[in-house]
Each structure stands twice: as structure tokens, then as C-alpha cells.
Regions:
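Acidic-enriched, low-complexity/disordered segments with a strong bias for Aspartate over Glutamate
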Residues: 24, 50, 71, 86-88, ...
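Arginine residue identity/basic-tract feature
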Residues: 17, 22, 61, 75, ...
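Generic serine detector
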Residues: 27, 69, 87, 98, ...
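Long, His/Glu/Asp-enriched segments that create or flank divalent metal/ion-associated functional microenvironments
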Residues: 6, 12-14, 18-21, 148-171
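Accessory structured domains or lobes within enzymes
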Residues: 90-96, 127, 131-165
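Acidic/His-rich structured neighborhood in mature extracellular/periplasmic domains
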Residues: 1-102
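Extended intrinsically disordered, low-complexity coil regions enriched in Ser, Thr, Gly, Ala
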Residues: 34-36, 78-80, 107-147
Length: 171
């Protein structure tokens, strides 16, 4: 769907059960893409632990590198019970990180924060460079990587291998 007028303030949104991607013409002030992005991919009805053919699995592997680098106290904050609900609330902007569960970026070491940057760079790699620059600019204007929250969810750990299949970066 296209909202607004291309050439002016506009937003293009494609959404479905496991997908919300966006491109915008600065339709919402201080908000990259006009709102949150969300994606998942299930190649098969019953995914295998290594997710063969899943286009987003390389990003999950990067996120799991962050988890593996965490110490015990950090893991306690980052690893949450359950899983996020499948609802409209899942993909709404929620403002600053207060009230968002997970490990704050401010609790990461420099090396861990570099892994977070690498993960986010991969997550944004399919977007235009101008959109990526806007996203990073918005992030910097709101406190940077230190203000993000990183969450991994116990439910849905395929293979019970401690490689977290469901995770989020928010803030």
C-alpha cells in the first residue's frame, strides 16, 4: 500500500503474517521507515533447528553471536520466558526503551555492542542507503545503541539447542 503522495510525504508498506517492511518519504518525523519493521520466515510448517532455506537465518546467527558473548547476568536479562504475541501490538512503535523487556544496550561491552551494530547492519542491508542513514541517524538522536533492548525467547527453541530462534532488537 502507498500512503500519501510519492515526491512528498509518503509511505510504502508491505505487510503479512510474518512481514512488515516499509519505505518512506519522511512521512513520520524522527522515525525511520515510517514505523517498525518486522519479519520472520518459515520455509516449512515445522522448521528444522538449522532453518534450511530461511532467508533471515543468517541474521539470527549474528544475534546468537551476541547471546554467546554475554555473561551470566546479561543472559538472565536477555533471555525471556514465552514468546512475543502474534498481534498488532507486536509491530507498533513503543517509544523509548522504558517498559521494554530485555538486556539494555548500555549493559553491553564495546565488543558486544560491535556485534549488535553488525547484526543491525545486516538487518538493514536490504534497504536503500539513504534509509539506512536515516535509521542510524534516528538511533543516534535517541541515545544510540545504548538505548536499544535485546531479547531472546525461550519458547520456540527448535532443537532445544540454546540457539535462539526468536529474538528482538527494540528501542
Amino acid at each position: 500500500a502507498v500512503f500519501g503522495e510519492p515526491g512528498g510525504k509518503f509511505e510504502w508498506v508491505m505487510t503479512g503474517r510474518h512481514l512488515t517492511i516499509r519505505a518512506d518519504g519522511n512521512s513520520v518525523e524522527n522515525t525511520a521507515f515510517g514505523g517498525p519493521i518486522f519479519y520472520g520466515h518459515a520455509v516449512e510448517a515445522n522448521e528444522k533447528p538449522d532453518h534450511p532455506g530461511n532467508v533471515w537465518w543468517p541474521q539470527a546467527r549474528l544475534a546468537n553471536e551476541i547471546f554467546q558473548s554475554l555473561d551470566g547476568k546479561q543472559r538472565e536479562k536477555a533471555l525471556l520466558e514465552g514468546t512475543p504475541p502474534d498481534s498488532d501490538e507486536t509491530v507498533r512503535l513503543r517509544g523509548n526503551a522504558s517498559g521494554i523487556q530485555g538486556l539494555p544496550g548500555s549493559a553491553l561491552t564495546r565488543d558486544q555492542r560491535d556485534l549488535l551494530k553488525k547484526t543491525l547492519k545486516s538487518m538493514l542491508s536490504m534497504y536503500r542507503e539513504s534509509d539506512v542513514e536515516e535509521a542510524v541517524g534516528c538511533l543516534d538522536a535517541h541515545g544510540g545503541y545504548e538505548e536499544l533492548r535485546l531479547s531472546f525467547y525461550k519458547e520456540g527453541d527448535l532443537g532445544s539447542d540454546g540457539i535462539w530462534d526468536r529474538w528482538r532488537v527494540e528501542g
